[in-house]
């Protein structure tokens, strides 16, 4: 698995190094058009290298997303983020992404949420979302899970789930959760999602 990570990091580092070089060119007076043209070449090379990487390793992204190593999960999320593989019908992967969107570490939550939102996978897989939400409610929650779930519902612009979440929280006798309920309620009142 170390080779897998090292090879991906080489591809990623090459992208970052070349992108920095292009930014430096632009800042040193090279025309915008030339800088954009150069950056497009860099991105094309990056996507080509990622495709070769995927063909070489043929990774099972669902398995990688469930790995205990957060580095491996991050690489899997970045491979999905790049959008080079159509995963829109992979229900297991969608379940894992939804779970990571709520219960993952900060970086995982952000990446998984952006993937789900940008690809429109939540609309197509609403039953999966509702099943995961009900499972999480059944397991009970603390301040952090309540906060992360509320933020997730806000980020996906699902006011119905956010309002239902607030109602569920009202049954819990916890001052910190009550503060979150007030914050989420103010968000709903202050703007329409």
State the predicted function of each range.
Residues 28-52, 74-87, 110-122, 144-156, ...:
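Structural detector for internal amphipathic alpha-helices that build alpha-solenoid repeat scaffolds
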